[in-house]
Amino acid sequence: GRGRWEIGIQGGVFSIFDFGAPSNDLVNADYLGGITFTYAFDSFSILTRIMHQSSHLGDEFLLNNEVERINLSFEELSVLLSYDPFEWLRAYGGTGVIVRSEPSNLERWSLEGGIELRPFTTSTKHRLQVLFGLDMRFWQQSNWQPDASFVAGVTLDPVGESSYRVDFLVRYYNGHSPNGQFFTERIQTLGPSVQLYF
């Protein structure tokens, strides 16, 4: 049969705060926005995305720390190919290229791949799935050193009622900081995550 086309819009604001400071200073905020084009056929799908990201340091953080501001922003074009051989397994991989950046000397290329396992699914009206996932990213700017993200948790997916989905996860990350101009620093984080999809 024929495949399916889908156009989507992505957006988000990701902020970090210094709760050790008297005024809970904003350290950094990343603003993301993009458009996605997806084509799905049988067990395969391909996603093409153009995304903009801009990062801004908090005013209090700049005043209280000797940090040189880098007005980091870029547009990236990426392509991901996904394969679902079974209902409980998905593997994906692809590449991205930065088409414009500030500063202009950022390396352009990146690779990404991962796997998702959903070994248990209820058949009730509100479908509940157990989820395990691994995502690996390699950026030329970081000399292709791996950034790894591991997740485990559950997904609530109301069957046949609406298109939303909620993920309740525990996430472990080991790699370069995803927070704006701190991308040269390696970090480790562990914490809960709640994600809502429409």
Walk through the language-model features, giving the residues of each.
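Short loop/turn motifs that connect adjacent beta-strands in outer-membrane beta-barrel proteins
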Residues: 1-7, 84-89, 119-130, 158-166
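Elongated scaffolding segments in large macromolecular assemblies
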Residues: 89, 93-97, 101-136, 144, ...
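Short C-terminal domain-edge/linker segments immediately following a structured domain
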Residues: 38-45, 79-80, 122-127, 161-168, ...
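Predominantly the C-terminal beta-signal and adjacent terminal strand-loop region
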Residues: 139-198
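Residues on the lipid-exposed face of transmembrane beta-strands in outer-membrane beta-barrel proteins
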Residues: 35-39, 79-83, 113-119, 150-156, ...
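Generic "edge-of-domain/loop-turn" microfeature
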Residues: 16, 44, 55, 100, ...
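Outer-membrane pore/translocation modules
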Residues: 2-114, 174-176, 183-186
